[in-house]
């Protein structure tokens, strides 16, 4: 099985919250696509609660678009990581990490302004696969934690696993 880019970085040295360019590529027509690792939690030490990350998924996607789309950038998708330590964001364009970090913080401020669970987008049986598994309070706790800790930038060069380590891990 081919080694995915996300498994070539040392998760024991990752900071959180932090932005990292996980991958860049170009379409056959020359459009740049960038995938960002938006790391909310320190891997193997913290995890977002399932109800909170699910609610955040519904809120974060719209709020990030409000703050990041434009000037050559259009978000394709924002999805939670299976490990519940962050989100992957795929977009058209190549914004720098600081622009993404600023949009992320603004989106977290927006999450804190949501006053009622009824304001969560697509929170119904028709548009959500687990519509009863939500917690606005947990989502706001996550947002508050991001803002209190601030958002840093993780560097692929600093986090790269040495080839020897990858061989040792039989990858």
Curated annotation (Swiss-Prot):
It holds the Pfam family LuxS. InterPro entries: LuxS_sf, Metalloenz_LuxS/M16, S-ribosylhomocysteinase. One of its GO terms (molecular function) is iron ion binding. Gene3D superfamilies: S-ribosylhomocysteinase (LuxS). Disulfide bonds: none annotated. SUPFAM superfamilies: LuxS/MPP-like metallohydrolase. Binds 1 Fe cation per subunit. Fe cation binds at residues 54, 58, 128. It catalyses: S-(5-deoxy-D-ribos-5-yl)-L-homocysteine = (S)-4,5-dihydroxypentane-2,3-dione + L-homocysteine. One of its GO terms (cellular component) is cytosol. One of its GO terms (biological process) is quorum sensing. Keywords: Autoinducer synthesis, Iron, Lyase, Metal-binding, Quorum sensing. It comes from the Bacteria. Belongs to the LuxS family. E.coli strain DH5-alpha does not make AI-2; it has a frameshift mutation in the luxS gene that disrupts the protein coding region. Involved in the synthesis of autoinducer 2 (AI-2) which is secreted by bacteria and is used to communicate both the cell density and the metabolic potential of the environment. The regulation of gene expression in response to changes in cell density is called quorum sensing. Catalyzes the transformation of S-ribosylhomocysteine (RHC) to homocysteine (HC) and 4,5-dihydroxy-2,3-pentadione (DPD). This is S-ribosylhomocysteine lyase. The lineage of its organism: Bacteria, Pseudomonadati, Pseudomonadota, Gammaproteobacteria, Enterobacterales. The gene is luxS.
